[in-house]
């Protein structure tokens, strides 16, 4: 994550503290077997600039990244779109970049998902991981989960499985290795 995920509303009230956001992120990461790494940029203040690109470059170099999953660069959330755009720049030498829609709001651009992953056997884990973000879940309500279930079900119907995640492919180099 690029930000500390603290969320402050329009009147300055903290809706989700850094501590709470980190704890929720840790719980979600544990559910899916991932490690959570957080940046310190402020939520709603991320901009597409060289500072963000260099942050991502350092991350890519430090962790020897060869596959990137990033926010869709046309997401209406300003942080998400800035991160998506900056990732295209920072990931220019990475052989595989996939973008995803991370929220349920609409935009004037079409998401062009063409790479499907069957998540039928892990959909319950996805739901648990989303619900682990308790402050977001409380704010959005049960409709948030229903949206993801319906979207993943619709994606699955397109390819003949129960649930699927779909990504927009920026580039995807398949690497075939010779057997020794």
Give the residues covered by each predicted segment.
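The feature marks non-catalytic terminal segments
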Residues: 27-32, 67, 94, 102-180
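Short, well-ordered secondary-structure micro-motifs
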Residues: 10-12, 48-50, 80-81, 109-111, ...
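Active-site rim/loop-helix segments in enzyme catalytic domains that contact anionic ligands
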Residues: 1-64, 92-93, 169
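Active-site adenylate/phosphate-handling loop in enzymes that bind or generate adenylated species
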Residues: 56-103
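Active-site environment of divalent metal-dependent phosphoester hydrolases
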Residues: 5-9, 44, 74-80, 105-107
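Alpha-helical elements of Rossmann-like donor-binding domains used by nucleotide-donor carbohydrate transfer enzymes
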Residues: 24-27, 51-58, 82, 86, ...
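Glycine-rich, phosphate-binding/catalytic loops in enzymes
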Residues: 16, 84-88, 116
